[in-house]
Amino acid sequence: FLNAKSGVHPDVVRILADFLNNEIYPLVPRHGSVGASGDLVQLAHIALALIGESEVSFRGEVVPAAEAMKACGITPLRLRIRDGLALTNGTAVMTGIGMVNLAQARRLLDWAVKASVMLNEVVESYDDFMAEPLNACKLHAGQIEIARRMREICASSRRLRKRETELYSGDTGEAPTFKHKVQPYYSLRCTPQILGPVLETLEQAEKILVEEFNSVDDNPVVDQIGRASCRERV
């Protein structure tokens, strides 16, 4: 609506802001289709609350929307031309769900990186698998970034071993005897290559979601001089 291409009345934007500022949250069913031709069912429940119908979450309780609005001095929305369709025919719900899932996925990735460092510490791996010169040989941004994060996490670790210290001490006397694995466990030393593509996928997902979040998703679209044009939803 803020791009001024939906043709809604300013009261629509005002009441949405009033709901957010007063922490009034419309109750929306957990189950129901999204994205077929807009998130019709879910957005309709939000629109119901704006006109004083349905129920909302307010101050930790589920109450009628009209009651919460009265307590905050908010007048129920009076729908004008274009308001009803604009409120119900969009992708706001699935975009919001996508944003929440993205935030949770980023948190899981962060935990996975930290857990990988911990596992390498448990088995006393050599730390060169995450070295900057090694990972810079591959031009995959995700791999390079995951390796950097791992180095940052284990910077003060006393459990990871240095290959140059244990295998190449400079002693030319007796032939060296390998007392530990020459390389860490395969699944552990390949963490940058495994989690790197995950990071790149999340970066691409964020790009798409941010673009959708800031897009005009309406039909018809009204330009700033008042002309309307219809389009097929994509």
Which residues are covered by each model-predicted region?
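Accessory "access/gating" subregions that flank catalytic or transport cores
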Residues: 120-233
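Active-site cavity-forming subdomains of large catalytic enzyme subunits
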Residues: 1-140
